[in-house]
Amino acid sequence: MRIRIPYVIDVIFVSDAEQIKRIEASGDVDRLHRYATAALPWWVRFYFGATRFHDAARDLWFLALEPASDPGYERRRAYLSERVATRYTRADVDKVARLLQARTDDEELAYELAQVVDRRFVGEEIPRSITTEARRTLQTFGEALLPWKYVRARRAQRDVTDYCAHAVGGGGDGHVVDVAHNIGTVAKTLTRALRMVAADLETPVERLFTAHPLTLEAPRIAVRSSRLGGLLRSSMRPGWTVVIFKIGAAATETRDLFFTFGSGGPRRACVFMDFFLAFAADVQGALRGMQSARPPEPSR
């Protein structure tokens, strides 16, 4: 499907798994920050400035939206991979499982999860105010159409990135938006994912997260005047046409985790993929153990 209003917007939605793979490999599209922020379509700048993916004040973008040709890409990915290699503990798993069993509210769960996953980036306890603000950034474009929600999301994004800029400092390899994004992902996406796990202790997490994908879309921007191998009646406009991969639909269709954590292949899949799956599986196992240890209900 294509939504095209001359001089206003040009967006193409692709949900077929094989088409997504083919377009991704074609070289016709790239990550959004292939172009300078000021040159991107107006609605991209408007929306992403209120998300965890972009720091408008410092003009910084999350790693997944940077082209692989960016000079800092390899260093940033290596830093994240190194930090992810620091595993969680059994005590972390048990604590989170107990919180889920007790039906702790999302705000408290997000705070505790941030200590497990994101403390490794800042070397200190992440304040509750920051994990709360991280939950307020935009998740969908529709939310950006609500003025009060948009203003609050911009403020929340600024507060989280300001905290990360202070905590990470200028001397380390940590990137402000990469750290801020991970805090937001834990506060919003991991919290939701573990609720899903707690509600279904029998289905393996690999099947859960393809049947119910956590990320539904991935944006790309045209870098060539192309009709995408005949899919389009008219060519894309480089630097203007945005292609939205409906990776959630592709994950459900194919049961392929590389659509849950990327665009259908291991290249540039989420750095946290293995950590995330292992942690979710261990929490699921701990919850099963708690359930089996629970005394039986008295007969009536």
Regions found by a protein language model. Name each.
Residues G142-Y163, D178, R207-R224, R300:
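Charged/polar, low-hydrophobicity segments characteristic of intrinsically disordered regions
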Residues S15-E24, D28, S69-V84, Y88, ...:
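Catalytic cores of PAPS-dependent sulfotransferases
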Residues D159-T210, F272, A280:
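Central I-helix of cytochrome P450 enzymes
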Residues M1-G49:
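N-terminal membrane-proximal hinge/A-helix region immediately C-terminal to the signal-anchor transmembrane segment
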Residues Q115-V122, T191-A198, A281-R288:
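Short, amphipathic alpha-helical segments that act as regulatory/interfacial helices
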Residues F13-D16, D200-R300:
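Cytochrome P450 C-terminal heme-thiolate binding region
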Residues T37-I126, I130-A167:
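Cytochrome P450 catalytic-domain helical core, especially the substrate-recognition surface
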